[in-house]
A protein has these predicted regions:
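Generic structural signal for small/hydrophobic residues in well-ordered secondary structure
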Residues: 6, 23, 45, 62, ...
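Conserved core segment of the aminotransferase class I/II
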Residues: 21, 190-256
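Conserved PLP-anchoring active-site segment centered on the Schiff-base-forming lysine
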Residues: 78-97, 124
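Short beta->alpha connector loops at strand-helix junctions that form conserved
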Residues: 87, 106-111
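A short helix->loop->beta-strand "cap" motif at the edges of active sites that frequently abuts
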Residues: 102, 162-164, 190
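Active-site phosphate-binding strand-loop segment of PLP-dependent enzymes
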Residues: 109-179
Length: 256
């Protein structure tokens, strides 16, 4: 049988020409940039996301990383609690949780629920010990199923009720063609960390640029991520950050 590898999700498409040209034009940029990311890029990402999500995000909410995967790993290291992980899921969530010494609470999803957990299934996990901290990983559109979560409001109510933090992995969100993508941040922005980047829609997986958008209500967590980032990757490649400004300020709807 043929085995399809979904671990990397390598895009078969080329990077838009204007973004490639922006990288060429900024190849000379050789200075360390601010650890949280180039100010102009964070501003562009915040404005782009605010329009997409209909919520007012600020540059201060944005953390630029060398791929969203690295930022997720830092989150696992920092988080003191248990990880609620739907199954099946992307290959690196569980190993990162183990490396971060966090216990995994796995929820086996079902076809009838579109391969996403229900609110009651999440609540059942939390009720085992309400005194613990919980972090839910929600990947929609999903790798490997390709499905979109349709019970976002139900899950958001559980998040609000039990102070559940949600990592919303939206790396494939620009590649939803059958229906308009909806983020769980539309229902509970104060509990949601948005994770995405250039790898999929832009075809720039090898450039290694991703970002977190962390709401003001989770500032303590954001500041802790910044501290860890400063002691690990320090800053993302300067030429790539400058080039990425074009990705979030120009219209690429025809490309997508």
């Amino acid at each position: 049988e043929k085995i399809f590898k979904f671990g990397f999700g390598q895009s078969p498409f080329q990077i838009p020409t204007d973004i490639v040209n922006a990288l060429k034009d900024n190849a000379y940029q050789n200075k360390y940039l601010p650890m949280q990311g180039l100010n102009e890029l964070r501003d562009a990402v915040a404005k782009y996301t605010s329009v997409k999500k209909d919520y007012n995000y600020k540059p201060e909410n944005v953390i630029i990383g060398p791929g969203s995967k690295e930022l997720m790993f830092l989150l696992h290291i920092l988080f003191d609690g248990e990880i609620i992980l739907p199954a099946p899921s992307w290959v690196s969530y569980a190993p990162q949780a183990i490396l971060g010494r966090n216990k995994i609470q796995s929820i086996q999803t079902k076809r009838e629920n579109n391969w996403f957990p229900t609110g009651s299934e999440i609540e059942e996990v939390i009720l085992k010990d309400k005194n613990k901290n919980y972090l839910l990983f929600l990947n929609s559109p999903n790798n490997p199923s390709g499905q979109i979560c349709k019970n976002l409001e139900e899950i958001s109510e559980i998040a609000k009720k039990y102070n559940l933090i949600i990592l919303s992995d939206e790396i494939y969100s620009e590649l939803s063609f059958d229906e308009e993508f909806k983020s769980i941040s539309s229902y509970c922005p104060e509990k949601t960390i948005i994770s995405t980047g250039l790898s999929k829609w832009c075809g720039a997986g090898g450039w290694r640029l991703g970002y977190f958008i962390v709401p003001d209500s989770l500032n303590i967590l954001k500041n802790s991520i910044n501290v860890l980032a400063s002691e690990t990757f320090s800053a993302v490649s300067a030429p790539i950050q400058y080039a990425a400004i074009t990705a979030y300020t120009s219209d690429h709807s025809i490309y997508i």
